[in-house]
């Protein structure tokens, strides 16, 4: 990625972590369809590899704004995709995708972080990976920790995530009939791939 700063990438990861961690409330639903978000999406589209994924997300948001009981419908989509059994879902855990659930714990320790008691999900939840990546990108911008150390940890985190994120995104596309979370997971997949390529 060339046009986005480390802080902007950190913000994208933090935003995605929030959206994948819990159902959207009314305020978040209003925010994602706001003019401010449209400006943010325009900035993201300035990064060519992200353009198609952001367009897909914007289309799903436009459809969402005319959907009756949008918040309730999205809540049902969230529960069906992320909280049910894995037979027709896209469970957001490394362990559900046959990956080492301890890897994220090791990465968090290496980064000097731990999971919050307010987040009642296992440590291998997708949102934890995204929060870690957000933290690492913010740290790159601060310059207090050697960039080489942060970059090494970022690469380890991206490598671990890339082992199961494509399957997760494919399951979102397969089982999210409305398409909001499918579009969100596609944006995440492209972002992670771009971030990984930026060694």
Swiss-Prot record:
It holds the Pfam family Nitrate_red_del. GO terms for biological process: protein complex oligomerization; protein folding. The keyword Chaperone applies. One of its GO terms (cellular component) is cytoplasm. Gene3D superfamilies: 1.20.120.1820, HscB, C-terminal domain. Involved in the biogenesis of TorA. Acts on TorA before the insertion of the molybdenum cofactor and, as a result, probably favors a conformation of the apoenzyme that is competent for acquiring the cofactor. This is Chaperone protein TorD. It comes from Escherichia coli O127:H6 (strain E2348/69 / EPEC).
